[in-house]
Amino acid sequence: MDPDAVKSTLSNLAFGNVMAAAARNYQKEVLANEKAQGSNPVNEEVDLDELMDDPELERLHADRIAALKREVEKRESFKRQGHGEYREVSEGDFLGEVTRSEKVICHFYHKEFYRCKIMDKHLKTLAPRHVDTKFIKVDAENAPFFVTKLAIKTLPCVVLFSKGVAMDRLVGFQDLGTKDDFTTNKLENVLLKKGMLSKKKKEEDDEDAEYQESIRRSVRSSENLDSDSD
């Protein structure tokens, strides 16, 4: 199959899926407004097909679709910088890692410390949730220069960097209730309050997830087209 044709098909499928989602959202808004005004939405159904062909709807949602595409591109750019996963870095790479990203959460750990393993588990969960923040860890035994420079005395120690500057830190579990059974959400909320994570609205998460799924469906459809052509 012609590669350009595949790309065109993928783009059209993705756009169609997003527009379908937009139409469903618009339909919900219309029905909600009717209900608020005291009308009966059961007797005033909105035709989904008509909404899909409505140029006004396309205009209203064009900016949102473009914004979603920009967000996907932004996420890919972050991932190329090492965001989106919880990685171990060496002392030699440490300085470059914390200065190349605006927000960096770095866990100084010891491989034999039980509490460090607990912190590892939670940070590993948070890393893919918050792609705009970089999550890394450094073996304190193998990074004596920065352990001394940052005056790290207790492990686990999670140092919070903003634009290359250590702005704050979590020492042990002091900010987490001092017990070992704190939840990932507890840690997430602490990091949110300290400005290290960006809080997204639920509807933005839903829309982004739906857009990502539409892209995946389009890719699968494209692959099926390739198989059929064979």
Curated annotation (Swiss-Prot):
Tissue expression profile of the protein: Expressed in embryos, shoot meristems, leaf primordia, root meristems, floral meristems and young floral buds.
Source organism superkingdom: Eukaryota
Keyword annotations: Cytoplasm, Microtubule, Nucleus
Residues in Thioredoxin domain copies: 89-173
Gene Ontology CC terms: cytoplasm; microtubule; nucleus
Subcellular location field: Cytoplasm; Nucleus
An example Gene Ontology molecular-function term: beta-tubulin binding
Annotated segments matching region Disordered: 197-230
Pfam families: Thioredoxin
PANTHER family named in the record: THIOREDOXIN DOMAIN-CONTAINING PROTEIN 9
Note: Plant roots over-expressing PLP3A have increased microtubule resistance to propyzamide, an inhibitor of tubulin polymerization. Plants with reduced levels of both PLP3A and PLP3B show defects in cytokinesis, cortical microtubule array formation, oriented cell growth, and maintenance of proper ploidy.
Similarity comment: Belongs to the phosducin family.
Protein name per UniProt: Thioredoxin domain-containing protein PLP3A
Species of origin: Arabidopsis thaliana (Mouse-ear cress)
